[in-house]
Structures are given as C-alpha cells and as structure tokens.
Amino acid sequence: MPERVWDRFLTEQDRSHLAMSARRRIGFGRKPALLLIDLYRWVFGDRPQPLLEAIKTWPGSCGLAAWQAISPIQTLLQAAREASIPIVHMTGLDHSGIEGWTAWREPPQPAAPSPEADDRRRRRWDIVDEVAPLPGEAVLRKSSPSAFWGTPLVGHLNYLGVDTIITCGESTSGCVRASVVDGCTYRYRMIVVDEGVFDRHEAAHAINLFDMNQKYADVVPLAEVLDYLAKWRAGQNQKPPS
C-alpha cells in the first residue's frame, strides 16, 4: 500500500488497530460538484514565502504549502470545467458588519493602520488570480468555518442533483474539515483531493486527513479524481439528448 502523509504520525497501536479493522470506501456517486474552499489572498500573500517569513505581513498565511497546492488545484479545476460539473468557490464574508469566528483570536488592530496593512485587510478575501472563478461559477461567502453554515450551498447542490462533493482548499484542519463533516452530515459523498488541500501546520494537516479518511470522506490522490471526471464526462457525452 502506498505511504500516506499521515503514516509517520501513527503509533504502533494505531497501526495495529488499522490492520484489524478494514475500512470501507465511500466511493464516487453519480453527480459530482467541485468545492474550492478559501483560496483567498490572506493565506497566500502576494508571493511565495516560507511560513515564518510570510506571517510577518500576512498573519493568516500558510506559507509555501499554499503555493505548492496551486498547480494541482489548477489541474483539478480545469478537469472540472471540461467535465461541465457544478463549481462552487467559497471565500470569507467581509464589509458586512458581521464578525466572523476568528474575531476573538485576531490581535487588536491599530487605531490608524498603515496604508499597506489597510490594503492587505481589504484584499484578504479576494480569491487569488491563479484559481479565480469564471463567469457562471458560483461564489459564496461564509462567516464560519463550514461552507454549509449560513450559506445557500445545500439548496444549490440539491437543486442540481449533486450527490458527490470533490473538495480542495484550506485549511485542512479548519474550514476543509468543518465543511467535510457537514457535507457528510447532509449525506453527500465527500471526496478530498490529497494534493489539493493544505495547512500551515504539517502535523495538523496530516492527522486531519487521516481522521477525515477514517470517518467522513475518501482522501484520494488527484490522479484518481481526474480519472473519475474523465469517465464521468465520457458517460455524459454518450447519453441521448433529453
């Protein structure tokens, strides 16, 4: 079995337990959608930098892990567009007078922030150009970790007949996990793209992928998702016109 990113964090007892209990895969369904979670400027900054350097100007940065995920996400996004499946981009809710869940943890803002700091805060929820939405792709804003809480996502997906949600974005241990758990609760088949999610903490990234894979989702390599989308697209093309 190929090594997984979480393997080096498992204890001997963990490994023994896994060997004794076979895990049944969730599998792909009949109608997929792609959910891109929080691919905004706040976690990328303006250029690739190591985490400890990047957070000096972009406190929410995920450092180089964010930039390393761009290419796989672009590949996934292109495949989803070619297959004509529903695509939903999630980002933060801002300029609304509503405090998000991070308000208590954020350091106090200076009474008169510098023009540069003010500009960064204005741009923080802007989805980065590399994976920007195209016209016709849904963009939803959220004020909580889950893509489902307080948003019309469920109604949108149900209307479209979606039963499978392919997920990428950040952070693995935060908004991705929260969205995956809620998606599972709503009885969607949740698929997490291994190379398409990232976190600022390596251990949190690995163990949350392990936990989601055990309980709520299938964590699968990009190649497997691309193969599924290609087959799904071919199947759609063979259907007689309605």
Residue spans for each PLM region:
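Active-site-adjacent betaalpha module
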Residues: 1-33, 42-51, 78-83, 95-98, ...
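Cytosolic catalytic domains that perform sulfur/thiol-centered chemistry
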Residues: 29, 59-66
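Short hydrophobic beta-strand that contains or immediately precedes a catalytic carboxylate
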Residues: 35-37
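A solvent-exposed, charged loop/short amphipathic helix patch at secondary-structure junctions
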Residues: 47-62
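Short, conserved micro-motifs enriched in small and acidic residues
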Residues: 63, 67-70, 173-174
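A short, N-terminal amphipathic alpha-helix
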Residues: 67-86
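A basic- and aromatic-enriched beta-loop-alpha substructure that forms the phosphate/nucleotide-
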Residues: 88-94
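A substrate-binding/cap region within the structured catalytic cores of diverse enzymes
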Residues: 102
